[in-house]
């Protein structure tokens, strides 16, 4: 750990005062992935199966794994810096930094203040967002609310997790599922991808998906989680579409939490969508928890899949249980 140093506090930034409601949008994306990619072979050998068994059950062929000296904060900083560069935003102009994560390097401090300081956003409000795999959507709602209420002008939202460090290598249910990574988005008034509506939900289901302070690894009832994940994401999407007065046919691309291939396909089938209308990057990345939605957004942009005029529907499900959906609208689409 680097030696502590006493910093001169930056003067507090006066907060914008509330005025009439304005819309928030996304001005740029960024992502960061560890260099090491691990295929199914070593995991399969450890749990006594063939690599194809893992691929068939999960749709995952490989995942990124952080090095021993590579922390969550480093990935978040890299993704955040790339998003700020893509949005042409000076870090000193950022009003808030939110980091959605379940795997911060320390219990305290949270990751967000460290990320903000490293990026040069020293006057920004900063905090971590929980809700596991749903964390990025929760952060999207929080960041958009800050902008819409005129409490902030520029928000850096990062989803980052390194759950390979919290995985039991001998547990067939979870050993092959998780990967590490970070994705980020810069939120500003009237950005290209207008945010909203956002819906979030939850229910108490602790014993079927958790990391406790004793084992410190993910424990999961896979069948129970699968059923509820598909159902709750479908429910959240239908609720959002009703609020937005849209039909699923009005949506150009669906980005569901990249939990595994079976869950992504099940959500797709619930809505009768063709595969090319649903983002699926899980084969190469695995389940990156809070990073999965922003990573998929960044990759979809690079692949030319985000519409110039149209709608992108985001949905996620995580421990808690927690779930949600959010709509991004590009261009002047009504």
Question: What residue ranges belong to the model's regions?
Answer:
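Short glycine-aspartate micro-motif
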Residues: 23-26, 96-98, 153-157, 311-314
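Buried hydrophobic positions in well-ordered alpha/beta secondary-structure cores of metabolic enzymes
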Residues: 26-28, 54, 83, 97, ...
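Condensing-enzyme catalytic core mediating Claisen C-C bond formation in acyl metabolism
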Residues: 2-69, 169-231, 235-238, 317, ...
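Acidic-glycine-rich active-site phosphate/pyrophosphate-binding loop
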Residues: 47-56, 107-120, 156-163, 207-211, ...
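Short, well-ordered amphipathic alpha-helical segments that serve as non-catalytic structural scaffolds
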Residues: 50, 72-87, 111, 228-244, ...
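Flexible, glycine-rich active-site loops centered on histidine and acidic residues
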Residues: 146-179
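Claisen-condensing/thiolase-fold acyl-transfer catalytic domains that form or cleave C-C bonds
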Residues: 3-5, 73, 77-80, 103-104, ...
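Conserved beta-ketoacyl condensing-enzyme motif
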Residues: 26-28, 66-130, 243-264, 270
């Amino acid at each position: 750990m680097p030696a502590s140093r006493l910093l001169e506090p930056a003067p507090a930034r006066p907060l914008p005062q509330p005025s009439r409601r304005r819309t928030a949008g996304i001005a740029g994306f960024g992502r960061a992935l560890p260099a090491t990619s691990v295929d199914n072979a070593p995991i399969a050998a450890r749990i006594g199966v063939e690599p194809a068994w893992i691929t068939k059950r999960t749709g995952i062929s490989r995942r990124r794994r952080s090095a021993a000296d590579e922390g969550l904060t480093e990935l978040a900083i890299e993704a955040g810096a790339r998003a700020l560069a893509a949005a042409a935003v000076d870090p000193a102009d950022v009003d808030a930094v939110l980091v959605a994560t379940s795997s911060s390097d320390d219990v305290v401090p949270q990751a967000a203040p460290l990320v903000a300081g490293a990026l040069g956003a020293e006057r920004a409000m900063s905090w971590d967002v929980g809700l596991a795999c749903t964390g990025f959507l929760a952060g999207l709602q929080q960041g958009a609310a800050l902008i819409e209420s005129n409490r902030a002008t520029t928000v850096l939202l990062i989803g980052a997790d390194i759950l390979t460090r919290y995985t039991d290598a001998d547990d067939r249910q979870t050993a092959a599922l998780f990967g590490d990574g970070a994705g980020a988005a810069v939120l500003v008034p009237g950005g290209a991808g207008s945010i909203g509506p956002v819906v979030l939900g939850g229910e108490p289901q602790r014993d079927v998906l958790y990391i406790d302070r004793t084992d410190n690894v993910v424990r999961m009832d896979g069948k129970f989680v699968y059923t509820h994940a598909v159902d709750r994401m479908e429910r959240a999407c239908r609720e959002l579409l009703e609020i937005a007065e849209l039909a699923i046919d009005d949506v150009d691309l669906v980005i569901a939490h990249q939990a595994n291939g079976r869950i992504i396909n099940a959500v797709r089938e619930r809505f009768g969508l063709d595969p090319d209308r649903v983002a699926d990057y899980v084969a190469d990345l695995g389940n990156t928890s809070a990073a999965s939605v922003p990573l998929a957004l960044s990759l979809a942009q690079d692949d030319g899949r985000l519409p110039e005029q149209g709608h992108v529907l985001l949905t996620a499900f995580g421990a808690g249980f927690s779930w949600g959906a959010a709509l991004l609208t590009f261009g002047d689409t009504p």
